[in-house]
Structure formats: structure tokens, C-alpha cells
């Protein structure tokens, strides 16, 4: 088994689930530059398909041709643990798991 090196880890940064709602809010309100490179728009549609993942979409694109051919789609990185509860909390709060406290199907009480 190989050792995990710091270089193997992805540092937090633009392009995570917690960046999505703040980026849309900034773009819609003019409250700063739109993060994530969102196009100018008066409204956005956010579609979540739980558990799909970009790799699954690429592998099974013949089963979801409409989703596979959508333009202006961006890959977003989820945090660890990559559970639905943690990911939805990141999207809804714009915060990382250590900040919002939902770490899997348990939560950290302040």
C-alpha cells in the first residue's frame, strides 16, 4: 500500500460545493465578481442528482444524453465525508463541514 502524500490531497479552493450558492448570489445581486466563472444571467437552475458524479456521467452518458450534452456545466468538488447530508449542508450554508458541523449523518454541537 502506498503512503498518502500532501501533494495527493486537494486543497480547498474555488470549485467546491460550498462555493455554489454564494457564487450564484454574487452573480445575481452584483455583490462582487461571480465565482466559478458563471455566465451573466438573471436566474440560474441548480440541478442536483445525488450520487451521480462526473465520472459516472461520463461512463454512462448514453443513459443520460441530455445531461451529458449540457453546456456551461462545471465540475464541483465535494468535501470529506462525501455523504448526502454533508454535501447538502455545504450547498445550503456555503460553509465547509468543519464550519457547519454536519459530518456524515451526525453533527457536531457547538
Describe every region a protein language model picked out.
Residues 1-44, 51-110:
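Active-site nucleophile/metal-coordination loop of metallo-enzymes that catalyze phosphate/sulfate
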